[in-house]
Swiss-Prot record:
Enzyme Commission numbers on file: 2.4.2.18
Cofactor note: Binds 2 magnesium ions per monomer.
Annotated GO biological process: L-tryptophan biosynthetic process
Binding site residues for 5-phospho-alpha-D-ribose 1-diphosphate: 82, 85-86, 90, 92-95, 110-118, 122
Keyword Magnesium: yes
Function field: Catalyzes the transfer of the phosphoribosyl group of 5-phosphorylribose-1-pyrophosphate (PRPP) to anthranilate to yield N-(5'-phosphoribosyl)-anthranilate (PRA).
Gene symbol of the encoding locus: trpD
Protein's recorded name: Anthranilate phosphoribosyltransferase
Annotated residues for binding of Mg(2+) 1: S94, E228
Species whose genome carries this gene: Dechloromonas aromatica (strain RCB)
Binding site for anthranilate 1: G82
Positions contributing to Mg(2+) 2 binding: D227, E228
Listed pathway(s): Amino-acid biosynthesis; L-tryptophan biosynthesis; L-tryptophan from chorismate: step 2/5
Length: 340
């Protein structure tokens, strides 16, 4: 499909079918499409509203072109990731939860980048903690093997995005590329806890992950507009398990947690996020620890470590209280420094 034909299709609010979208994405990612046409097409898709099929096709091309991290299959492998864009400016909840999960029996292949709309992206806080994030795919694999935790800095694995990045920067609005990152884990983690910035994306992205062959997935959206499981409101959930999809809501009270404002979880920089992360892993009581336990518990459930989210929360608390989660952070940082 030519870019001009694709643009005409989206202007008419008609779907671009799978093979056409695959062809179009390959052209975009190889630099064959001009910046003007890229901007027009992705704007048209946004206005039309991207379909499950269009997103799945685009993600399949991103996966095909990504530089992979080759690790043995493990049913406890999980990615904990968010689309960002929720404008909540909370500390790095998913990054903190990832260390808890790795300490409690999961294996984490975390995929992320620098801040776009938040105060601190995953890459920013890990660097603030002293980790070396500029690892080769082989070094990331070695880190996962040694520590049970690895971080894949997105620009190192999606080099074809260089043709799109300047367009996205200049446009400054959400497009299909905001939701492709969480769908394209270079290590191929079979399980995912994915936070999304809009309620409509819960049902859409859990079905995209189903089409992409994921095993277990929780797509979540806090109804206070958080792209995590929230302490401040009910959370919408789309669950994929054994090929079946369920959609439901969960509440903090379901797990004996008190609903509370996110105000005390906000940060203004990676340094502030670092301090909050260290406080949680140091077992400092408060809402930050509670929201991390809630999200880590869900990740342990989706990673086949816990039998339920509630069981996962118990395991998360134990990993923090015992010092295992903080030890996992230190182990990871030391492992990455060996490659500096």
């Amino acid at each position: 499909m030519t870019p001009q034909a694709a643009l005409q299709r989206v202007i008419e609010h008609r779907e671009i079918f799978h093979d056409e979208m695959v062809s179009l994405m390959r052209q975009i990612m190889s630099g064959e499409v001009t910046p003007v046409m890229i901007a027009a097409i992705i704007t048209g898709l946004r206005v039309k509203k991207e379909t499950i099929g269009e997103i799945a096709a685009a993600a399949s091309v991103m996966r095909e072109l990504a530089t992979p991290v080759k690790v043995p299959y493990d049913r406890h492998f999980v990615d904990i990731v968010g689309t960002g864009g929720d404008a909540a400016h909370t500390f790095n909840i998913s990054s903190t939860a990832a260390f808890v999960v790795a300490a409690a029996g999961g294996k984490v292949a975390k995929h992320g980048g620098r801040s776009v709309s938040s105060s601190s992206g995953a890459a920013d806080v890990l660097e603030a903690l002293g980790a070396n994030i500029m690892l080769s795919p082989e070094q990331v694999a070695a880190c996962i093997d040694e520590t049970g935790f690895g971080f894949m800095f997105a620009p190192n694995h999606h080099t074809a995005m260089k043709h799109v990045a300047p367009v996205r920067r200049e446009m400054g609005v959400r497009t299909i590329f905001n939701i492709l990152g969480p769908l394209t884990n270079p290590a191929g983690a079979p399980n995912t806890l994915m936070g999304v910035f809009h309620p409509d994306l819960v049902g859409i992205l859990v079905r995209v992950m189903q089409r992409l062959g994921a095993e277990r997935v929780l797509v979540v959206h806090g109804k206070d507009c958080l792209d995590e499981i929230s302490l401040g409101a009910a959370t919408m959930v789309g669950e994929l398990n054994n090929g079946e999809i369920r959609e439901y809501e969960i509440h903090p009270e379901d797990y004996g947690l008190q609903m509370q404002s996110l105000r005390n979880l906000r940060v203004g920089s990676a340094a502030e996020s670092r301090e909050m992360l260290l406080g949680v892993l140091g077992n400092q009581p408060g809402p930050a620890r509670e929201i991390v336990c809630l999200n880590a518990g869900a990740a342990l459930y989706v990673a086949n470590v816990a039998d339920s989210i509630g069981d996962g929360i118990v395991r998360a608390r134990e990993a923090i209280a015992s010092g295992a989660a903080r030890a996992k952070l230190d182990q990871f940082i030391n492992a990455t420094k060996k490659f500096a």
